[in-house]
Every structure is written in structure tokens, then in C-alpha cells.
Amino acid sequence: MQLDTDYLENIKITKDKLNKISSSMCMAKWFQVSLHLPNGKTHSCFHPPARLVPLTELEQDPGALHNTKHKQVQRQKMLNGERPSECEYCWKIEDAGHLSDRHYRSAEWWAQDGWNEIKNTDTILPRYVEVNFNQACNFKCVYCSPHLSTTWEKEIKEFGPYDLSNIKHNDTQYLDMPFQSSNDDNPYVKAFWNWWPELYKTLKVFRMTGGEPLIDNNTYKILDYVIKNPNTDLELSITSNLCPPDNKIINRFIDKIKKIEQIRWWEDPNKLNKEYNNNNFVGSSCKHFSLFVSLDSVGEQAEYIRYPLDYNMLLDNVNKFLEKTLTTEICFINTFSILSIPKLKDFLQLILDLRIKFGKNTQTILEIQPPDRGEYKHPPVIIKPKQRIWFDIPMLNNPKWMSDVVIAQDKSLLAILDDSLTFMKDNVEQEDYYKTGHGFKKYEIEKLKRNIDIIKQKSLKDEELKNHVELKHFYMYFSEIDKRRKTDFIKTFPELIDFWNIAKADNGS
């Protein structure tokens, strides 16, 4: 309970620190970057649109993957107290009276050594880096697109884009598709590997996304680099669907993580071990490893959203990963759309069940003896029980016909949301949390409440709802999905039948 209170208090303190600089300051614009290397795009945090990195800038400095001229202008705006329009996601939440991701991100531990660097808007080494090396993916999630998934691209090549009255959705002619060259010839991938040794020195968080990272060789190149070049400050993570096409892949991945976890000696001439005042270190190859698992619902509804997910296989792999590794964590990412809501309470129950199964009270304090170094015998490394199950519920912005715009039109969905919020409050962490790790945290409850408030603000009047373009798109899109994939929306989502019929009638069907 105290940990949760301290977390929220830290965010409020960070808000005050940001406001002393300006009312629009955000540390993420300096110290966080998401890189989409297949099509050469970059953005700081996932809310602003990704923008192309000009090759002319990249040729001068591989660090332009983060420090583009455009981003330098946005940083200056923030220092001046202006609100960059590309950050509207946070402005919308703040204007609704809530703390936004601007506050949450700026309060993260990885940003704290950068407060003295923010006056420099030009050349910054990010501390938090997300990278997508490759669009290769064996899934075609309903809210995804061909430029992020080869399976989606294959479907569009076979059937064409989705004709939704006034738009052609997922038309590859208008998407920023990956370069039609091999990964080795991609100038952005080359620039990344040229930048990597310098970037790695100050890196605190590194996250690989996709596509599906587990089927990309760059992922294993990174893991091998970390094994050979340990970094005590590094939080390493991967976002995965955790259902690779071959079981050998999951085994290979787990074996790499087990090697990273191994306790070892090493010397780093560029870093001081403050505890012993020397350059020698003992520990695992990184601070810790987290696996982010994309999962938006449970059972058949999860399989529909993240087609062709095998839900039982995913659960098996979750358990296998947690059982075979010692210090790892899993964070489930529920991309919050209209399809997430019908089984939201069941999703939350899954979180509770896993927190019980892999809770702190099921773990023991480990004493791992490092290998001797000459005649010196190092004391055992102590590994304490930890929280291993996390989740997040970022709201989907696009496509609009799955977003908060349409969610608010179905009162039954609002009732499910309110019931789910009550469920979380009824299962809030108790005083024995330090021993168990069970229950929901206050800030997790606050995030769902925030989502609900935003959704309710989007409610349309009956006359506005009629002929609303997103209703048309909703019906047309999922009707075509069912036709192409031999699925059945109504059978899978019976909770949405009334909404479906309204959307169907709005299409004149």
C-alpha cells in the first residue's frame, strides 16, 4: 500500500518539477524514442505520430534517428510553454482533469538523471529506446496494418484494401510501407547498428517491438550483445504475441534469457561500481528483463482481435516462460478498444489469478554463488521475491471505429466498464501486499477510471449518432473481416449484438 502511495506522490512531485520549467514540458521528448526502422520513422513515446527521419540528416549523424530537426523544434516549444499539437493525447487527458502519460513518463526512473540536460535541444542520448527492426509478423490484429505485419500485407495483396464507403482502409499505396530491400540494405537499420555502441553506454531501458521480435534475427543479435556486454543499469524488454509459428523459437528465446540471468563477473572500464569503488561488477547481464505480452481480451474474443492467436498456447507459453526463468516479469498490454470491453472483467480476473500463482509468497529468497575469481570468493548474490505480473490498458486511437468514439454509444458497455471498475476496487491490494503481490494497485484502478471518464465524454446524442460515419465503418469493416477470415463477429461478441444491429441499420442493411 505504501509503495502505491509513494508512486502516486512521486508523480505529483514530478508534475511540479515539470511546471517549474513550463506547463507543457515532457522528459520523453528528450530521453525517450520509438524507432520504426522498416520505414525509417521516429517519435518520442507512442502517442505522437511517427515522422520520417530525413536521410540527409542520418548521413551526417546516426543519432538523427532520435534528434531530428523536427523534434528539436518540438523540444523548444515545450521549453517555451507551448503545447505541441502532436501531443494532443496528453493534452486531452489533462484537460479532463487527470494526470497524463506526460507526468507518468517524466516520473520514470530512467529520466531522472536528465534534468540538467534539457536545455540542450539538439544532441541527446536517449535513456529509453523502443525499436522495431522488422515488420515480419505471424498475426494480423484487427487494429493493425500491413506496414507493421507481413501477414496483414499478404491479406491485402490477396483481397485488396477494405472499402469503407469514403476510405480504403489499409491500402498499401497510401501507407508508409517498409523498404523493398533486405534488412541488411535498410539505411535505418544500418544507422542503428552504427549508433548502438554509443547509445548502449547510457541506455537504461531498451524495448524491442515489431512485427514479432521473436522471429527477427536482430532480436537475438541484441540479446547476444547484452550477454557479452553486461549493463547493470539496463532494463531490457520485448513485446511479443508469444505465439511464434514454431515451438523451437520460444525455447531459443527462453534459453537466451536464462543466459542473461546467469550471475557472473565482469569488468567495465567506463563505469564505476560505487559500492566497491572499482570497475568490477557481479550480477546478471542486465538489471532485469520484462516480457510485454499483447493481449486485449480472453478466449475466443482475444483470438478474434489478434487473429490467428491460439489463446491456450499463449497461456502455456506465459506459464513456461515464468517457470523456467527466475527474475523476469510479464506485463500484459491490453490495447483498449470496443472489443476489449465485453470480457474486461475476465481479463482482470486472469491478472489476479496469475498474480496469485506467481505471487511473492510462492517465491523464495535465492542465494546464488558467483564463480570464484582467482583466490577471491564473492559473497552470494541475493535475489528477493518480486512482483512478476503487470498489465496496462493504453487506449486505442485508431481506427476510430474501434475507439472511444464508438464505445460511448453503447450503454451496456458503459455498464461493463463501471462493473469492472468496481471489481478492481473490491480486489485492491491489501496490507499484506509486500508478502503476496496480490490485488490491484491504486494507480491501475486510476488508469481504468481515466479511460472510462474519457469514453463517457465522447457520448453522442441520439440525433448525432444516426448516420455517424464511424458506425458505418464499424459494420462494413467487421463484415468484411468475417468474410475474409471465415470468422463470426456476432457469435464471438454476443454482448455487442445491439450495437451491431444499430450499425447495420445505419448502413441500410
How does the language model describe each region?
Residues 3-108, 395-509:
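Accessory C-terminal segments flanking Radical SAM cores
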Residues 27-44, 119-147, 204-208:
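N-terminal pre-triad scaffold of radical SAM enzymes
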Residues 91-95, 144-150:
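Detector for the c-type heme attachment site
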Residues 98-127, 137-139, 160:
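Recognition helices and adjacent regulatory flanks at domain boundaries
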Residues 126-136, 147-187, 200-216, 229-315, ...:
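Core AdoMet radical
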Residues 189-194, 220-224, 249-252:
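Leucine-rich repeat
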Residues 338-354:
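Catalytic cores of alpha/beta
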